């Protein structure tokens, strides 16, 4: 499911939750941007496509990105499920965002094994072999440090 997390920014962080070694991690979900079209998929960067479209010409349309390099450890106190149910009182913009998030979530569910495997691989490469993966290490957050910080505030 999609979840949101409070941040210092004006909007919450939106992402999916996975388990890595018993620790919950949020993988940030980024809205589609033009710059993503020419970027190649990498171990820490997963493109989300509109595969549910009835129109084949849209099946390769990028509708979001999962940034594994920016996944963060979280605890239950900061996780809240996002309501994606369409409501007749929603504004047109809110309806459009919900439909996009429904498509993104559907794609993530269909590709959950790949997402989990890649996230675990990125985590392992950064925490176990940082010197062998310097470019990846530069792009990624420090998972160990973030886990230590979270443990100071965590009660679950």
Model-found features: residue ranges?
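Short, small-residue-biased leader/transition segments that mark boundaries at the very start
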Residues: 2-10
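General N-terminal targeting signals
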Residues: 10, 34, 41-43, 83-91
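Conserved catalytic-core segments centered on acid/base and nucleophilic motifs
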Residues: 13-19
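Compact nucleic-acid interaction/catalytic patches
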Residues: 19-62
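C-terminal terminal-subdomain/extension
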Residues: 49-156
């Amino acid at each position: 499911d999609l979840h949101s997390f409070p941040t210092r920014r004006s909007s919450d962080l939106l992402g999916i939750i996975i388990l890595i070694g018993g620790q919950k991690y949020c993988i940030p979900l980024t809205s589609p941007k033009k710059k993503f079209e020419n970027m190649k998929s990498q171990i820490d960067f997963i493109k989300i496509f509109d595969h549910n479209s009835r129109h084949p010409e849209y099946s390769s349309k990028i509708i979001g990105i999962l940034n594994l390099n920016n996944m963060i450890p979280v605890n239950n106190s900061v996780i809240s499920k996002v309501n994606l149910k369409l409501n007749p009182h929603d504004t047109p913009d809110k309806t459009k965002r919900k439909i996009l998030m429904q498509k993104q979530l559907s794609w993530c569910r269909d590709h959950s094994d790949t997402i989990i495997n890649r996230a675990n691989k990125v985590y392992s490469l950064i925490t176990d072999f940082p010197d062998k993966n310097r470019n990846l290490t530069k792009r990624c957050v420090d998972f160990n440090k973030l886990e230590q910080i979270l443990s100071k505030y965590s009660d679950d």
